[in-house]
Curated annotation (Swiss-Prot):
Name of this chain's protein: Ribulose bisphosphate carboxylase small subunit, chloroplastic
Stated family: Belongs to the RuBisCO small chain family.
Gene it is expressed from: RBCS
Principal location class: plastid
Function: RuBisCO catalyzes two reactions: the carboxylation of D-ribulose 1,5-bisphosphate, the primary event in carbon dioxide fixation, as well as the oxidative fragmentation of the pentose substrate. Both reactions occur simultaneously and in competition at the same active site. Although the small subunit is not catalytic it is essential for maximal activity.
Note, other: The basic functional RuBisCO is composed of a large chain homodimer in a 'head-to-tail' conformation. In form I RuBisCO this homodimer is arranged in a barrel-like tetramer with the small subunits forming a tetrameric 'cap' on each end of the 'barrel'.
Cellular compartment(s): Plastid, Chloroplast
One GO BP: photorespiration
Assembly notes: Heterohexadecamer of 8 large and 8 small subunits.
């Protein structure tokens, strides 16, 4: 899924 870091950078994770 797509999650966002606290600093606001887009981070793509596969669950």
């Amino acid at each position: 899924x797509q999650v966002w870091n606290p600093i606001g950078q887009p981070k793509f994770e596969t669950f």
